[in-house]
Amino acid sequence: MTSITALLPAPRYPTPGPKMSIFTTNAVSMAKNDSVPKYGSRTDWKPTSQADFNDGGAYPEIHIAQYPRNMGKPGSVSSNAITLKMDASGSADYSLIATQGHAADRHVQTSYDSLIPLRERIDAGTVSLEKPGEEAEQSTALATQAAFDKRLAANDKSGTKNKSDPQYIRYTANSMMGTEGGESQKIIKMVDLPQDPLEPPKFKHTKVPGRPASPPAPILRSPPRKLTAQDQKDWAIPSTVSNWKNQKGFTISLDKRMAADGRGLEDVKVNENFAKFSEVLNQNEKTMRDDIGKRREMQQRVAERQAQEQEEKLRELARRARQEREVGDESKGKEKEADGEDDRGRSRERLRSVSRDGDSDRSLSRSLSASDRSYSRSRSPYESRSRGRSYSRSRSPESRFRGRSDSRSRSPGYELERAAKKRKTERLERKREAERDLRLSKMGTQQKIKQLAKENSRDISERVALGAAQPQKLAGEAQFDSRLFSKSGSLQRGFNEDQYYDKSLFSAQEAVQSIYRPSASGDSVAEDTIDRLETEKRFDVLGKAGKGFEGADGEERDGPVRFVRDEE
C-alpha cells in the first residue's frame, strides 16, 4: 500500500529540519538513564545529578534537600522557565503553559475533554451536579462583592478620598520669652478638611501627544528590467474596432479586425452531448404530440357520443310528450264528440216539443230571455267583456265545420287518411333528423359545439314538457334585491327596532284586486248600457219579415252554431 507522501508532489523549496526541543532532549535522556532504581527500592539511593530528576520531579520518599533543575537552590539564578510535568498516562502535561500567570482558583480549560458536555463524559457519574448550598452561595457572593469594590475603587475618577479617622495630638508649649509654659499641654484633634464632591476639578489634564508611528514595512521589489520586444508584443492591447460604426471612414484590415474581436483567443469545443440531448428532446416532443393528439381525438369521440346519446334521450322524451299530448287531444275530442251527440239529441227533442206546443215555446222563450237579461244585469262589465271574448274565440273555423268533421270521422276512409298523414309526418321527421345528423358529422368541432348549444336552448314550454326546465341558480349579489339595501324603514316603523317590516305583506295584492275588481258606481252605468242595447230596435226601419225560419225563434242560442247531417 502506497503512503500519502508518495502521492504528493516533490517540494519546490528545501525546508530545514525542525529544531529538537528541550522536551524531546529530555525524553531521550530519560530513556537512556537507567540508573534510577524503582519505587520501593530507593532506601539507600540519593539523587546526585540533574539527570536523576528527568523522569519528573523530586522524590518525596527520600528525605533530603532536592533541587530538580536547580529550582530553589541557594545561589542559583531565577528563571521563568516552566517545569515539565507528566500526567497520569506518562505523557507531558502542556496545560501548565495555559495556566501560567492565572490565579490558582481559576479554572482554565486546557484539554479536549473540556469541550465534551458533562453528561456525555465517561466519568459523568463522579461529577457532582447538585445545587450548591447556602454557605457556598454566601462565600461566592462575598467574593464577588469584594471584587466589584476593588474594581470600583480602582476606577474612581472623582479624586475624592475616603474619610480617615481623626487623629488626636498632645501639644506641649515651650517656654518662650521668659515664660514658663512647660506645664501647659493641649489635646489637638486633627480632621480632614471637608471637600465638596460636586466641586469641579481644579486642574486641567492635557493629553500627551503620542509617539510617532513606526516606519512602514519595506516592500521588496525586484530590480527594474528592460522590456524586450516579445514582452511589448505580449502586452500590446489592440484598439477597439466596431463592426457597426465607422464614422471616420478608415480602412481596417481583416487581421486587425480579427485581433480586436478576441474570439480567436480560445478554442471552442462543442460537446456532442448537446446534439444527442436535442435529438432526444425532439423525439420525446414528437411522441408526446402524438399521444396528446390521440387523447384529444378519443375525448372528442367520447364527447360526440355523449352529446348524441343526450340528444337521443331528449328526442325520445319529446316524442313521448307529443304522443301523450296527441292521446290527450284524441280523448278530449272523443269527449267533445260525445257531448255534441248528447246536445244534438237534446236539441231535437226540444224542437219536437216546440213544434207540438207553440204557446209553451213562446212562454219558454220569454222566460229564457228574461232570465238571460237578469243574469246579464247581475254580471259585471269585466265578466261580460270576457264572456264576449271567449265566445268570439270559440267561433273558430274548426267549430264552424264541426258537423263536417264529425261526419268525416265516422267514415272508414277518414281513419285511413289520418293514419297515412301520421306516417307521412313521422317519415318527414326521421328525414329531418337524418339530414341534421349528416350536417353535424360534416361540421367542425367549433361549429358543432355552437350548433349543440343553440339546440339546447329550447323553448320553455318544450323544456317543461320534457321535464328539463330547471330554475336558474343565482350566486353572489344577484341573490338579493339591491333596492332593499338603500331603504331606511325607521320612520315608517315608528322608530321601533323590533318591527322589521315597513309595509304589510299583501299590500300590493290588495291594490291589484282593487284595480281589476268592478266598483258599485261602475256597475250601474254598465247595466244601463246593456239595457239600452237590448231594448233598442235598430233594424225596424228595414221592415219586419213576414215569415221567419222554421225553429229560429224557439230559444236563444248560448253557444256556437252546430250543423247536423241529415239522416238519409
Curated annotation (Swiss-Prot):
InterPro entries: SKI-int_prot_SKIP, SKI-int_prot_SKIP_SNW-dom. GO terms for biological process: mRNA splicing, via spliceosome. The keyword Nucleus applies. The keyword Nucleus applies. Keywords: mRNA processing, mRNA splicing, Nucleus, Spliceosome. Residues 365-379 have a biased composition (Low complexity). It is found in: Nucleus. Involved in pre-mRNA splicing. This is Pre-mRNA-processing protein 45. The lineage of its organism: Eukaryota, Fungi, Dikarya, Ascomycota, Saccharomycotina.
